[in-house]
Amino acid sequence: MDASHTPHDITDRKNAIRSEMRTRLATLTADQRAEWSTAACARLIRSVAFARASRVMLYMPMRSEVDVISVALEAFRLGKSVCVPRVDGSRKTMSAVETTSFDDESMDSDSLGVRAPKVGQEILQEEIDLVIVPGVAFDMHGFRLGRGGGFYDRYLARFSRDTATIGVCFDIQFVEEIPTEPTDIAVHAVVSDRRAVQRDPSHALLAIQDRNHT
């Protein structure tokens, strides 16, 4: 945390960014969301992290988020295991649950109203090779701004460095700087519909095979 800013200042700045993102995202048409989601997912699928992962954790998209279901379907096609978050709002915890389908018969809603498998094996964090992370906003250093619950920060903090973490967003969700606190966790890379940004380009596992930006 920047010593020049109090926790209250940081909360105010985060809330201001959330408000700005709501305004930006509200302008998107369904066609734009679909087109930009397709572009971002194509970059994810081309990443070395995805190619090498045997088990991928990704989120169930909300209307304002990049739709990553095509990444899951490609993972299924390649024989990879897929898991998605299940949140326990009362305990403020997140776990990963394996899924093989996203149809209505297989899915339900967790305590926050986000789709999650009705049944499924809980996957230990050390068994996950790649985590695809949503966010309200990201900066070029890999810091993300979530919705304020802290679920992903607490969950990501327990991963080893060997697990690749990649944020995904629409390009309009990039900001110059996310105000941070000690509990905020940066992802290793961020992928949007227009670019791929790596916090540590020397880490081969996180290299993005980006044909449009060579």
Protein language model annotation of sequence segments:
Residues 3-4, 90-214:
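Conserved phosphate- and dinucleotide-binding cores of soluble alpha/beta proteins
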Residues 2-127:
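N-terminal active-site beta-alpha-beta segment that forms phosphate/nucleotide-binding
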